[in-house]
Amino acid sequence: IVACPTGALTEKDNTQQVIDAINDPEKVVVVQTAPAVRAALGEEFGMPIGTNVEGKMVAALRRLGFDKVYDTDFGADMTIMEEANEFIDRVKNGGKLPIITSCSPGWVKFCEHYFPSLTENLSTCKSPQQMTGALIKTWFAEREGIDPNNIISVSVMPCVAKKFEINRDDEDAAGVPDVDISITTRELARMIKMAQLNFARLPEEDFDPVMGVSTGAATIFGATGGVLEAALRTAADVLEGVDHDNIEYKEIRGTKGFKEAVYKVAGMDVKVAVVSGLNNANELLKKIESGEADYHIVEVMCCPGGCVNGGGQPIQPSTVRSFTDIK
C-alpha cells in the first residue's frame, strides 16, 4: 500500500466477492469508478503515468460482466451542491465554522479519534462514493423496478479506506448498504488480467448515463484543493445568483501539503485552508482547536496530494504521481 496511516502492508482483496456477485444470476451488479482511477489504471498495463483510460476502463468493466457502469463524478456533483449549501446555511444561521470536508474516510476516522471536539464541524454530506451508492439503491432501483436487496453496488476507488467507509452505520439510504463492495484500482487491474482482456486493444466506451452529465468541478475532487474549489465555485454562484465562468482559485491548487487563501464571496471575505497528509492536518487542526487559526472552510485529504495518491493506486513514488496526475 502506498499510503496508510496505520502502516498496513497490503489491502484486503475483495475481487472474489465481486466475481461471485457477477456470476449470481439473481443479482444486478452495478459499478461506479472514481475520477482518480481512470488516470492511474493504465499504468498497470504499461501505459505512461497519467494516461486517461476512461473509455477502455468502461469497456473492460462491461466485459467483466457488470450490468451498469456509472461515473462517481455525478455523485461528486451532488456532494458539491450539498456541501456548498450546507456552508451557506451555517454562515446565514450561525452554524458551526469552519465547515470541514468529510469525503476522505481516513481523515474522518482520524478526526473522530484525535479531534473529537471538531466532529461537529465535519460536513454532514455523504462522500461521492456513498452519494452514488445511495442513488443506485434508491433512484436506480425504483426506476428499474428492482428490489434494492437484489442489487450489488460495487465501487472502484483509489482509496483503501473506502472499504471501511462502506460499513459505517449511517451509510444505508435504502435500508441496505449504499455500497456493498469497494475495490481499489490495483484490484480492478488484477480482475482485468485474470479475465485475460487485452486492455490496450479495448474500444473506447462511454459510462451509462445517471441523471445527466457531470461537471469539471466533480473531476477535480481527486486532487488536493479540488473539493474546496468546487464548493467555493458553487457557493459563489448560489449566493451571487450568477454563473461565474472565469474565477481562478490558483492559491489552493497544486501539490503543497498546506495552502490557505481569502476569497471574496457575495461581499464576504471567506478564509479557506487546504491540507493533505495527516501530519499537515494534525498541525492545522491543533491550531483550529486552540483558536489560533480561524477559517470558514477547510479541506482535509488523508493522502498527500489527494486521492490521486491513494493507497489503492498502482505503486509509484507519491511525488511522481502528484506532479503527473494533478497537472
Residue ranges and their predicted role:
Residues 1-7, 302:
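Cysteine-centered iron-sulfur cluster-binding motifs in ferredoxin-type domains/subunits
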Residues 10-327:
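Iron-sulfur-associated redox domains of electron-transfer enzymes in respiratory
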